[in-house]
């Protein structure tokens, strides 16, 4: 139940609030898409992963590819980012 409520909240943000400002996320997938995937994979702990990701998304970071890790972690998935840069 809580998981569904969180997902609906993020989807409402994506549909109604996000379009009001220009795209500014420095990561792929976007921070809101990351949070959705994190919640789907890790349940309510995924919200912590999403918040950590939002805190990492600012003008002083290069950004890049940062998918949701299979195991719960609040850190950026650095191995995937390096592999994406080589490709």
From Swiss-Prot:
Cellular component annotations (GO), alphabetically ordered: plasma membrane
Tagged with keyword Cell membrane: yes
InterPro entries from the UniProt entry: Membr_insert_effic_factor_YidD (IPR002696)
Annotated localization: Cell membrane
Top-level taxon in the UniProt lineage: Bacteria
Family: Belongs to the UPF0161 family.
Alphabetized HAMAP family for the sequence: UPF0161_YidD (MF_00386)
This protein's name: Putative membrane protein insertion efficiency factor
Organism annotation: Streptococcus pyogenes serotype M4 (strain MGAS10750)
